[in-house]
Amino acid sequence: MSETILEVHHLGKSFGSHEILRDIDFVVRPGDVTCIIGPSGSGKSTLLRCMNLLEVPSSGEIRYHDADIMDKQMNVPEYRSRVGMVFQSFNLFNNMTVLKNCTVGQEKVLKKSKEEAEKNAMMYLEKVGMAPYINAKPKQLSGGQKQRVAIARALAMEPEILLFDEPTSALDPQMVGEVLEVMRKLAKDGLTTVSYTHLTLP
């Protein structure tokens, strides 16, 4: 059996008296493409946010290469660079160009030089078909283009796992296909992913 990257054990999450997650268990291994399926309001997004430490679990544990991610010794920014996340609402910096959106995290968190960060960003922007738009601002892009930039930004941090939090929910139907195509290519390339989406990847 191959080494696990992430292990979720007996995970629970409550907001006040409202229980969202109860006793969740699963493991993620290199190359896995994991899809979280369930009705609206069942806690799928909350689960991904717990895995990225945007929410702190109420009980249970999440282990990354056997290290407890809730341990006080855990370097959270570094962990988040290894377990990246693509959000429903893109979360791009509207005052920055496409290229800058994809380099700022590398420079701040990974301490890469501007030149190295730009070279790396360009590689991933080309991968998602957004290299021609490096000088554009997010407001000049379609929803599908914004999400492809968000994916490139996450990839530029060179994550071991990429979490997709309903990446197509904010898109017009005609834009969904281009984002799903990028996700299919990433899966074929062997990137480990965990996705919450109402759509399947044929």
Task: For every predicted segment, state its role.
Residues 3-199:
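ABC family nucleotide-binding domain
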